[in-house]
Swiss-Prot record:
Necessary for efficient RNA polymerase transcription elongation past template-encoded arresting sites. The arresting sites in DNA have the property of trapping a certain fraction of elongating RNA polymerases that pass through, resulting in locked ternary complexes. Cleavage of the nascent transcript by cleavage factors such as GreA or GreB allows the resumption of elongation from the new 3'terminus. GreA releases sequences of 2 to 3 nucleotides. Belongs to the GreA/GreB family. It comes from Ureaplasma parvum serovar 3 (strain ATCC 700970). Residues 1-84 form a coiled coil. It comes from the Bacteria. The lineage of its organism: Bacteria, Bacillati, Mycoplasmatota, Mycoplasmoidales, Mycoplasmoidaceae. This is Transcription elongation factor GreA.
């Protein structure tokens, strides 16, 4: 089973980022390291230390992206219906704690953006809503305190 659920758009962004790391950034940092080595003593060479730190950060990001690209499932490949909430669903909910209605979209963890109301299915709210139907009240369990929401409408 895939560890990451992502949209096609996010997948393409990650593929482009990996290409840039491999084709542009990695060769540039390799050149910086080579130039720093040519300066002589590496024990007090700030350019060398900075380049090594940047190389380590680039390697970490490259490894993260490769892990995602080896273990993903496209959201578009997940079957959706307007009968029950699933990843990719846009739903209207009533939040009793905030005393307001909200429209949110459930997305994979790699696509979440709370400021755009894109909520990860891995969050307490996302977990509480998945596989629920219109009209259902659910309790969202958070570390601070649980709260209730009601599914008003499954838009798509």
């Amino acid at each position: 089973m895939a560890k990451y659920t992502i949209s096609k758009h996010r997948l393409e962004e990650l593929q482009l980022e990996l290409r840039e790391i491999l084709d542009v950034k990695w060769p540039a940092i390799t050149k910086q390291l080579q130039d720093a080595r040519e300066q002589g003593d590496l024990s007090e060479n700030a350019d060398y230390d900075a380049a090594k730190n940047e190389q380590a950060a680039l390697k970490k990001r490259k490894d993260e992206i490769e892990e995602i690209l080896e273990n993903y499932e496209l959201i578009e490949d997940v079957l959706r219906s307007t009968d029950e909430v699933s990843i990719g669903s846009t739903i209207e909910i009533y939040n009793y704690q905030k005393d307001c209605e909200e429209v949110i979209t459930l997305v994979g963890s790699m696509d979440s953006d709370p400021f755009a109301n894109k909520i990860s299915i891995d969050t307490p709210l996302g977990k509480a809503l998945v596989k629920q139907k219109k009209g259902t009240e659910v309790t969202v369990h958070t570390l601070a305190s649980p709260y209730k929401v009601k599914i008003i409408k499954i838009i798509d």
